[in-house]
């Protein structure tokens, strides 16, 4: 059985973000993905990302728009987290080098879409935001020496001990492999 400090399963935006966040705290992390690193649902996502990151906007306004568009079906706490932390993540990824669409002066472009009261939808590569995001963030992950990547590994099961996840049981090239994790 191999051992790692922390394991993250999945190489979409959530998994890549988690791996980078863990590595940023000084911990080693193993990122496990069922295909090539860039092959995820994020890669195929089209459209843009709504984020209240501009001076004429605020996450609370974004939350109000989301609640109104949801016609009472949205969880207010989840909407608050999404609009507040989502804006923070978009700023972080823009600063880290994700190639969001920009004008001739280098300002991030934004559009007014759907039920938004402010122009807050940003794109990368036009309508290929997911592809650009996945490629850019995957490159950041590959360059990070604290992140070990295991590609083409199918997650068969979680290893649970004492009610806590203690690792993952993987299928790699037809062979079973257990990867123990401290966290």
Give the label of every model feature segment.
Residues 2, 25-26, 136-139:
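Noncatalytic alpha-helical scaffold of FAD-dependent oxidoreductases
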Residues 7-8, 17, 99, 167-169, ...:
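Structured core elements
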Residues 2-4, 175-183:
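Core beta-strand elements of the Rossmann-like FAD/NAD(P) dinucleotide-binding domain
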Residues 24, 172-174:
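A generic beta-sheet turn/junction motif
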Residues 34-172:
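Conserved N-terminal/central alpha/beta ligand/cofactor-binding core
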Residues 11, 153, 182-183:
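Structural detector for helix-capping/boundary residues
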Residues 5-31:
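N-terminal Rossmann-like FAD-binding beta1-loop-alpha1 element of flavoenzymes
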């Amino acid at each position: 059985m191999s051992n790692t400090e922390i394991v993250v399963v999945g190489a979409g935006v959530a998994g890549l973000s988690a791996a980078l966040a863990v590595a940023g705290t000084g911990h080693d992390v193993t990122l496990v993905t069922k295909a090539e690193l860039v092959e995820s649902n994020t890669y195929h996502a089209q459209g843009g990302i709504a984020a209240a990151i501009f001076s004429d906007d605020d996450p609370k306004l974004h939350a109000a728009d989301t609640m109104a568009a949801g016609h009472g079906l949205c969880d207010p706490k989840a909407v608050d987290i999404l609009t507040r932390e989502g804006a923070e993540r978009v700023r972080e990824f823009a600063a880290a080098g994700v190639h969001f669409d920009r004008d001739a002066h280098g300002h991030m472009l934004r559009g007014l879409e759907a039920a938004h009261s402010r122009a807050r939808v940003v794109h990368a590569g036009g309508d290929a935001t997911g592809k650009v995001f996945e490629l850019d963030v995957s490159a950041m992950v590959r360059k990070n020496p604290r992140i070990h990547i295991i590609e083409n590994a199918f997650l068969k099961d979680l290893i649970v001990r004492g009610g806590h996840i203690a690792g993952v049981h993987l299928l790699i090239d037809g062979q079973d492999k257990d990867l123990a994790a401290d966290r």
